[in-house]
């Protein structure tokens, strides 16, 4: 059976309870003596489990370089690499020794047919060894042949006969003692005078020369003809010579 406490007595009861607690604490203090000597440390306990990893620390400063290590052994040969780009052209080297003859090349294509006239070589030179007086209009015969390619000059007649039409050059050098005039003649059966060369001297040795380019047709003759001034000489030390040669053949003939 609960006991009813009047509301007016509650403060008194609280005061009495507080005073009782104070007395109890003072009684406990009065029973406490001086501190004792610390005892011997106990045996270390069993290590506890590892703790959780801590947070990463701040990056430290760079350390000093280490000592150089020993050279390692050579590894196996690797695969060839990709070819690099071509380098720059180097300087020109010295000329090498002369090589041997190469193999003969293949024959070239057949050429076009040529004109036989383009390959003709026609030339003559003849001297006069006959030292006898000449008559007017007489053909001057140069009887000693020096050169006569293709035999277009006839020493027995003293005439050149054209066999290949074209341009020819004729010249003469005549030694004489006194006045000398000669005619350069051309034609077939009836020759015509082309030009007359003259040189005048009285009782003295001289050399007369002359030359001309003529366009000849096949069968025409060319020769020198004497005039009334015909002191021509033909002897050792005073030679007279008649020459001629083909310059260009007539390709249209």
From Swiss-Prot:
Any GO BP annotation: complement activation
For bias type Basic and acidic residues, the affected ranges are 70-79
Q: How is its activity regulated?
A: The C1Q subcomplex is inhibited by sulfated molecules, such as triterpenoid sulfates, heparan sulfate, or chondroitin sulfates.
Compositional bias of kind Gly residues: 96-105
Subcellular location per UniProt equals: Secreted; Cell surface
UniProt cross-references to InterPro entries, sorted A to Z: C1q_dom (IPR001073), Collagen (IPR008160), Collagen/C1q_domain (IPR050392), Tumour_necrosis_fac-like_dom (IPR008983)
Q: In its UniProt entry, what is this protein called? A: Complement C1q subcomponent subunit B
Print the organism lineage. Answer: Eukaryota, Metazoa, Chordata, Craniata, Vertebrata
């Amino acid at each position: 059976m609960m006991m009813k406490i009047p509301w007016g007595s509650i403060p008194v009861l609280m005061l009495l309870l507080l005073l009782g607690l104070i007395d109890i604490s003072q009684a406990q203090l009065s029973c406490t003596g001086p501190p004792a000597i610390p005892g011997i440390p106990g045996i270390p306990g069993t290590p506890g489990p590892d703790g959780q990893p801590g947070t990463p620390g701040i990056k430290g400063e760079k350390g000093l370089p280490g000592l150089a290590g020993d050279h390692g052994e050579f590894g196996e040969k690797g695969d060839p690499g990709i070819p690099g780009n071509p380098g720059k052209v180097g300087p020109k080297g010295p000329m090498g020794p002369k090589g041997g003859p190469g193999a003969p090349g293949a024959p070239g294509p057949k050429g076009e047919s040529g004109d036989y006239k383009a390959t003709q070589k026609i030339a003559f030179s003849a001297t006069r060894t006959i030292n006898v007086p000449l008559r007017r209009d007489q053909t001057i015969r140069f009887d000693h042949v020096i050169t006569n390619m293709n035999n277009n000059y006839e020493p027995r007649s003293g005439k050149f006969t054209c066999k290949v039409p074209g341009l020819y050059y004729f010249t003469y050098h005549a030694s004489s003692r006194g006045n000398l005039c000669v005619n350069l003649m051309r034609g077939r059966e009836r020759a015509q005078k082309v030009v007359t060369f003259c040189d005048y001297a009285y009782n003295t040795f001289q050399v007369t020369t002359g030359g001309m380019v003529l366009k000849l047709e096949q069968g025409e003759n060319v020769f020198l003809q004497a005039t009334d001034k015909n002191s021509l000489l033909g002897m050792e030390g005073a030679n007279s010579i008649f020459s001629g040669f083909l310059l260009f053949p007539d390709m249209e003939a």
